[in-house]
């Protein structure tokens, strides 16, 4: 799933979520 901003990653992560170059990254799940 392509993301445009950090809000697009909210459903994918539990704790820290951010969008970088179209990809959602999670930390501390």
UniProtKB/Swiss-Prot annotation:
Free-text function comment from the UniProt entry: May act as a toxin.
Further comment found in the protein's record: This toxin is only found in male specimens.
GO MF: toxin activity
Protein name: Orphan peptide CllNtx
Highest taxon above the source species: Eukaryota
Location(s) in or outside the cell: Secreted
Disulfide bond keyword on record: yes
PTM description: Contains 3 disulfide bonds.
UniProt KW keywords: Disulfide bond, Secreted, Toxin
Tissue: Expressed by the venom gland.
Main location: secreted
GO CC annotations on file: extracellular region
